[in-house]
Amino acid sequence: MTDSQDNRTPESPQGVDRKAEGGCPVLHDGVTAQGSESENPAIDSPTPRTGGRPNSLKDWWPNHLDLSVLHAHSSKSSPLDPGFRYSEEFEKLDIEALRRDIVEVLHTSQDWWPADFGHYGGLFVRMAWHAAGTYRIHDGRGGAGQGAQRFAPLNSWPDNANLDKARRLLWPVKQKHGQKISWADLIVFAGNVALEDMGFTTFGFGFGREDIWEPEEIYWGPEDTWLGDERYSGDRELSNPLGAVQMGLIYVNPEGPNGNPDPLASARDIRETFARMAMNDEETVALIAGGHTFGKTHGAGDADLVGPEPEAAPLEAQGLGWHSSFGSGKGEDTITSGIEVTWTYHPTRWDNEFFHILYAYEWELMKSAAGANQWRPKNGAGADMVPDAHDPSKRREPRMLTSDLALRFDPEYAKISSRFKDHPEEFALAFAKAWYKLLHRDLGPIARYLGPLVGETQIWQDPVPAVDHELVSDDDVAALKAKVLDSGLSVAELVSTAWASAASFRSTDKRGGANGARIRLEPQRSWAVNQPEQLAGVLDRLEGIQREFNEAGGAKISLADLIVLAGSAAVEKAAKDGGVDVTVPFRAGRTDASQEQTDVDSFAVLEPRADGFRNYLLENEKAQPEVLLVERAYLLGLTAPEMTVLVGGLRALGNNVGGSGHGVLTDRPGVLTNDFFANLLAPGAQWKASESEANVYEIRDLASGELRWTATAVDLIFGSNSQLRSLAEVYASADAREKFVRDFVAAWVKVMDADRFDLA
């Protein structure tokens, strides 16, 4: 792998450059904990426009609620035909022909960007790793699933320097196979093929990633310079939901925290960052060592000679950045990270050399030609053991990164590294599984995987059993609805349970949702937002109905299906009570996962900090509730109109956590009406913050001062924000009663079916 972690930063402005407790067991030779003078790459960061005339709503009104994220990636940005379906086009792909084409690229060195060691394997592994490695567990963003590495800011991050060349090398392959293979799939499949071509046996590969056509607005950190680290507080506590240690990095600084070459301090950063990618210690060691079995990093000269990144490069660069004026600027003169390291004796062959070399030598700190911190064997050991990447007559010693030495000197990592050194078969299997997880973590359930190369199902894919019974008929559905409505459960109880089951879905990494009925399992059944005591009672009643129906013989219904069906029956009843007859579409086919199929720790990150659809906000939450509502809507894949109609309808249905009356702006709770909007926008009201309850507002009659309603910021935003008010006005209108119900049902079904990839 080449330059997988090759970036550094100047000394932290927050003073966190320090050695780990107990000191470092590796000789530093008097090198300070300052960062290298030549960072990766040592070019100016993009300069945000300042002092100019405001040119956006946010410039004029910084607190303006931005809804644009709810309308990103619309069909208007795609050049593909309206009826295009990637899964159907993919079926036409000759996968073996694609593989052969990639292998040919791997072995065909191009003069405009020569291959290290005559093989682009290390470069392609790095490209795939960095595409997938942006994934983070806290909000499911990042990852390889959309081909986002093609766009800013990722295409211009310092950690992705010269990966523009890797994608350009692949362009003839993409051009040949067209829309039968997405860029998102091709980028990571090329890395997979590269590993196999260098002798590694992978765990498998699943296609199915669909391209986006515009950059995605993602919060990558608060910094406005490359390699800034304002994301820390306290004792180097990394802010959520971030994963990387510095702006513009995929993982950690390879020289050590903020350029401090301390392996033990580096281990702390590595453990935190990889955990936020859903990797445990064994997976972390396997990934780093497996990736660094291949290729090299690049620091041939002064990084000040490296030009701007792709987004800042001139038109004539045609999307390529980091043009270097050092020598030829390529081949043996390449500058990417400023670090000049080749880890193993055979950089294009899978083997166990990384660990043997790591333990075979004692290491001393040295500087690259670019001034970067790196490590070599003491006393000139290992000289002439490593080939030169471009001149077969030259040899050199093996070298390591500070982050590599962490795998030897951190006590927990050392146990794993030592075992992998002595048991190469365990290392190979661990790397195969960890690599598979890395590439597929954001692809979602196995139902989304395409192609014949898919590996054995893993628990991190949140598996659900296959359907093994006859599904319910329309008559069965009608009978079950009647049973549910006659069970004594209220509309609010049925709706809130169905919502809690389905609304855990995240469109980012396709996790959560109603399929599997994990609402009845830990950890979800104990989340405060899911009202555990009420939930237990509802589930007990529904399980009784399920048991009675299934014991009758014939068709069967899963609890996952019944929870959704029960909520839909409640919506139909509430609409009818409001004078509108409607049938909520229902498609059976969900199954029930077991606790053994559910990784409790993995699911814990899905617990919401806030859910504006339930008027729920975690105590001491600092973010604005209305901003968190938009975030929740985004994760559910909703548009602004869908978010609007759902909030209004769910308030009327009593979906608030704890039965709170905040935002229930109706005299007919439990009836599906547009009262929320009508009363919110009604003139003659005075709104003011409550003096007795935080984050609550009182709505009083302007003339009498009588308290009429209470609400939260999530409610008031639909009257305050001009864009949301325009939507609320549609649903508050006298002619909107039936439209409101229709739109609510459509949005409700969208959430209930969000994880039904089997229906796609």
Swiss-Prot record:
Cofactor(s) needed by this chain: heme b
Region (Disordered): 1-57
GO molecular function, one term: heme binding
Active site (catalytic residues): 130
Pfam families the record matches: peroxidase
Protein name, per record: Catalase-peroxidase
Binding site residues for heme b: 292
Record's function text: Bifunctional enzyme with both catalase and broad-spectrum peroxidase activity.
PANTHER family (alphabetical): CATALASE-PEROXIDASE, HYDROPEROXIDASE I, BIFUNCTIONAL CATALASE-PEROXIDASE
Top EC group: oxidoreductase
EC code: 1.11.1.21
SUPFAM superfamilies the UniProt entry points to: Heme-dependent peroxidases (SSF48113)
Cofactor note: Binds 1 heme b (iron(II)-protoporphyrin IX) group per dimer.
Annotated crosslink Tryptophyl-tyrosyl-methioninium (Trp-Tyr) (with M-277) location: 129-251
Entry similarity comment: Belongs to the peroxidase family. Peroxidase/catalase subfamily.
Coiled-coil parts of chain: none
Assembly and interaction partners: Homodimer or homotetramer.
Catalytic activity: H2O2 + AH2 = A + 2 H2O; 2 H2O2 = O2 + 2 H2O
